[in-house]
Amino acid sequence: NAEFSYLMKYNLEYDKKDISELKKAGSGVVRHYKNKFQRPRPYELAKEMNMDFDSMELISDSMKTPAYPSGHSLQSRLIAEYYGKLYPKHKENLIELADECGYGRVVAGWHYPSDHTTSVKIADKLINMVDIQESIIDIPRKTYAPAVFDNADTNNPKIKASVVKQIQDQIKVFEKEF
């Protein structure tokens, strides 16, 4: 990853776990929208329409998913934004590397420009919602469970209706923008 190389080149501290968590957060959002919109990749559409289309060949599991939005664009932007906050003097260069990563996939014929630009917009919103420093998973269940679950102290806890509603409301707000 270009972000790793950059951080290493300038001896900037980074945590592979943090990067992994950012990628995981981005991946969940990307999967949601890929499944929702099922947009074919440019080379797939060209093939179906019997059009000549020049694209780079890549055999990868990520290429077996729909095009929209671009996971690489979203994840690299999340990483760039996160480390850009930690190292403001390097933010512009990190963003530039993230854009190269994402837009390079457009140039390769694997994505449409809107796959990239939408992913950047999603990442810019998502970075303010992601807190990788402490996850609810990392907190002992007894600490958070009563606020989140009914029957929290049993083997069969149920998420509280108020929590489900809050999550559904957040998803609706997020989807209006994308």
Name each model-derived stretch:
Residues 1-111, 117, 121, 125, ...:
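Hydrophobic alpha-helical bundle signature of multipass membrane enzymes
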